[in-house]
Amino acid sequence: DFGHIQYVAAYR
């Protein structure tokens, strides 16, 4: 699941 990817994208 790449659902957390959006979180990382916004985090960086």
From Swiss-Prot:
GO terms for cellular component: acrosomal membrane; extracellular region. It is found in: Membrane; Secreted; Cytoplasmic vesicle, Secretory vesicle, Acrosome membrane. GO terms for biological process: angiogenesis; cell adhesion; single fertilization. Coiled coil: none annotated. It is a peripheral membrane protein. Its main location: membrane. Keywords: Angiogenesis, Cell adhesion, Cytoplasmic vesicle, Fertilization, Membrane, Secreted. Specific ligand for the alpha-v/beta-3 and alpha-v/beta-5 receptors. Also binds to phosphatidylserine-enriched cell surfaces in a receptor-independent manner. Zona pellucida-binding protein which may play a role in gamete interaction. Contributes to phagocytic removal of apoptotic cells in many tissues. Plays an important role in the maintenance of intestinal epithelial homeostasis and the promotion of mucosal healing. Promotes VEGF-dependent neovascularization. This is Lactadherin. It comes from Capra hircus. The lineage of its organism: Eukaryota, Metazoa, Chordata, Craniata, Vertebrata. The gene is MFGE8.
